[in-house]
Amino acid sequence: KKPFIFEKDDIRIGFYLCTENEFTMATCHTMGANPFDVLDSFDEVKVLKAQCDYVIVLYHGGKEFYRYPSPMLQRYCRKFVDSGANLVICQHNHCVGSREDYQGGTIIYGQGNFIFNSDFYVNHQEFVKDAILLTVDVTKDDFVVSELPIRRTDNGTRLATEVEATETLEAYRKRSEEIKDPHFVTQAYKAFADTHVKRYLREFLGRSFIVRAINALL
């Protein structure tokens, strides 16, 4: 739960990390990741910002294989910026998402995967073929975030070629323009949810002990 503060050349950068509901979250009795708490997390970022020149929030949240923020995720990330964050990076969607420049801060809704070779993700080439690294140029007076596209191959991860980088960044910038419209964010997420609700229900029921027991009896 304690944030990390990095200091160099008289510049202090605070890092605040948290996660949405995951099996790895810390509890009163076990170690684990810092859980996001809508009642505490924003205030903790405010306290951190009072000690630093800049704050970076790493937020493990978002929907897998969804390239846009949900309306609620967008509200959370904007609230982090309102609380003092200069950069908010969301990590859970496992694909290159979109970028929002908001109130002087930067929000990245998904970088993609650097190295993630499990069969589940390899079978979703549309989403895992590319990713972006982030570079942050920092001075006392400026904080600039830029993207560097990379590609996953059978031999590992490499920098994208000029053509590949253009492909990744053009799609990324198009999505970044689309999310400037709040109606788009809402409607796109509704469409995504409508197409996935049946799959989620199937997976939930398929993993249910009671359903498995009934199936075995029948």
Language model features with spans:
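Binuclear metal-dependent hydrolase catalytic cores centered on His/Asp/Glu-rich metal-binding motifs
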Residues: 8-58, 75, 158-159
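Divalent metal-coordination and catalytic microenvironments
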Residues: 16, 56, 92, 109, ...
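Short, structured patches in soluble enzyme cores that scaffold and shape functional sites
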Residues: 17-20, 59-63, 111, 147-149
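Acidic/histidine-rich helix-loop elements
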Residues: 21-39, 63-66, 115-126
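Conserved beta-sheet core of the metallophosphoesterase superfamily
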Residues: 69-132
